[in-house]
Amino acid sequence: MLDRIDLKILRILNGNARKSFREIGRELGISEGTVRNRVKRLTEKGIITGFHASINPKNLGFEVVAILGLYIKPSKVEETLNKLKELDEIVELYQTTGEYDAVCIAILKDIESLGKFLAEKIYPLVNVNGCKVTLVLRTFKDGSKMPI
């Protein structure tokens, strides 16, 4: 069970994962050691799964963000998702209900790279029965922060 202090620590780290335990402790009026122990416990429980930099793909030359809706053979969903999660181009992957069996977000350098990615890595998967691609025109908000 999370208490008020745990939630405050999570909110602070959610906004700035580089903030030191000392800074967090000062902000909350608790010791650095208390913060360290709580973060360790939250990590061991799987609540904190990592600390990541938020990177703008366009500034690194990745111009294409594609949303792929995948139709997968029902008996092969788990196996196929495990293969897809290993692809570097896929930055988010979800098993879904509704029209698609899975939805993923892929980031690529350009349209040519997208075509190559689909032809060489997605379409050859024998368990993928089809794929609908939607290109992102602009990003107004990404999902990198939790609403806590």
UniProtKB/Swiss-Prot annotation:
Gene3D superfamilies named among the record's database cross-references? 3.30.70.920, Winged helix-like DNA-binding domain superfamily/Winged helix DNA-binding domain
Q: Which residues bind DNA?
A: 21-40
Report the SUPFAM superfamilies cross-referenced here.
Dimeric alpha+beta barrel (SSF54909), Winged helix' DNA-binding domain (SSF46785)
Keywords attached to this entry? Activator, DNA-binding, Repressor, Transcription, Transcription regulation
MF-aspect GO terms: sequence-specific DNA binding
Q: Where is the HTH asnC-type domain?
A: 2-63
- The record lists the membrane-crossing segments as none
* Any Pfam family the entry gives: HTH_24
Question: Which InterPro entries is this protein grouped with?
Answer: ArsR-like_HTH, AsnC-type_HTH_dom, Dimeric_a/b-barrel, Tscrpt_reg_AsnC-like, Tscrpt_reg_AsnC/Lrp_C, Tscrpt_reg_HTH_AsnC-type_CS, WH-like_DNA-bd_sf, WH_DNA-bd_sf
Q: How does it assemble?
A: Homodimer.
Function of the protein: Participates in positive as well as negative regulation of transcription. Binds to its own promoter.
This protein's name: HTH-type transcriptional regulator Ptr1
- Organism, by scientific name, is Methanocaldococcus jannaschii (strain ATCC 43067 / DSM 2661 / JAL-1 / JCM 10045 / NBRC 100440)
